[in-house]
From Swiss-Prot:
SUPFAM superfamilies: Family A G protein-coupled receptor-like (SSF81321). Glycans are attached at residues 5, 89. Belongs to the G-protein coupled receptor 1 family. Expressed in testis. This is Olfactory receptor 1M1. Pfam families: 7tm_4.
Length: 313
């Protein structure tokens, strides 16, 4: 029997969203527009919250962090895909692949945890309005954001260290548009049991657990809203949560489908479609979801835009 060739791959080929070159111009134009909207939208949210003192509250502090994470999540994947399409060079070195994977998981975990933190913020605001400022103190807000940054760094680094021990021999084509964990594990010719177990543990910790916390928060919120005597009061209370619920549905609807569904029902096409949702579509839509229904944020955005126009003229 011939010994296997265990020379690890030095680079991978990202096959992208479509293997048909005819689709490239459309995909390039579409994702370039989406990325530009994502960058402008999220940076405007951050600037509006930073420069308007009326928005220096816990809710907007968490929103600014979410916008920063969304911007970074999209920047980690979309520009590389655009370069690959434009240059028709779809290769990525192994170190760059691991780096992209690290930041993808880092910002993805942050996104998940921040959305759960924002649900807790809404729970305190609606269920304990008189004690809101006491509970959501600057120290607690700092911890609710700072701890997830450290937590995300540790988990992402563990993923990379476990991945670095694997050997890739033979086929080096990834049926994806960025370096994601699951497609890479399929290419390994060594035992990936430890990696797969860690993926399941992390999925439970950073997807299932925050999602359960969100459901618990909104269960308490619904009970509190139902106790409000007037229909107008109930509508006003629920309107403060509607934007966040939309983001929850967008983000967790796709991530649960990718990381918690059995591998038997997952396909490369489904994985790529879900990845597009949470790396490109959701970061692009979040600024619109939060700003369209929020008068204070719309007012702050108008001030920034008007100031820019007056400065230019």
């Amino acid at each position: 029997m011939e010994p296997q060739n265990h020379t690890s791959a030095s680079e991978f080929i990202l096959l992208g969203l479509s293997e048909k070159p005819d689709h490239d111009p459309v995909l390039f134009s579409l994702f370039l527009c989406m990325y530009m909207i994502t960058v402008v939208g999220n940076l405007l949210i951050i600037l509006a919250i930073s420069f308007d003192s009326h928005l220096h509250t816990p809710m907007y502090f968490f929103l600014a962090n979410l916008s920063l994470v969304d911007f970074c999540l999209a920047t980690n994947t979309v520009p590389k895909m655009l370069v690959n399409i434009q240059t028709r060079n779809k290769s990525i070195s192994y170190p760059c692949c691991l780096t992209q994977m690290y930041f993808f998981h880092f910002f993805g975990i942050m996104d998940s945890v921040l959305i759960a933190v924002m649900a807790y913020d809404r729970f305190v605001a609606i269920c304990h309005p008189l004690h809101y400022s006491t509970i959501m103190s600057p120290r607690l807000c700092g911890l609710l954001v700072g701890v997830p940054w450290v937590y995300s760094c540790f988990i992402s680094l563990t993923h990379i260290l476990l991945m670095a021990r694997l050997v890739f021999c033979g086929k080096n084509e990834l049926p994806h548009y960025f370096c994601d964990l699951t497609p890479l594990l399929r290419l390994s010719c060594t035992d990936t049991t430890v990696n797969k177990i860690f993926v399941l543990i992390v999925a439970g910790m950073v997807i299932a657990t925050p999602f359960v916390c969100i459901l618990a928060s909104y269960a308490r919120i619904i009970v509190a809203i139902m106790k409000v005597p007037s229909a107008g009061g109930r509508k006003k209370a629920f309107s403060t949560c509607s934007s966040h619920l939309s983001v929850v549905a967008l983000f967790y609807g796709t991530t649960i489908g990718v990381y918690l569904c059995p591998s038997s029902v997952r396909t490369a096409v489904k994985e790529k479609a879900s990845a597009v949702m949470y790396t490109a579509v959701t970061p692009m839509l979040n600024p619109f979801i939060y700003s369209l229904r929020n008068r204070d944020l719309k007012g702050a955005l108008k001030k920034i835009i008007n100031r820019k126009i007056s400065t230019s003229s």
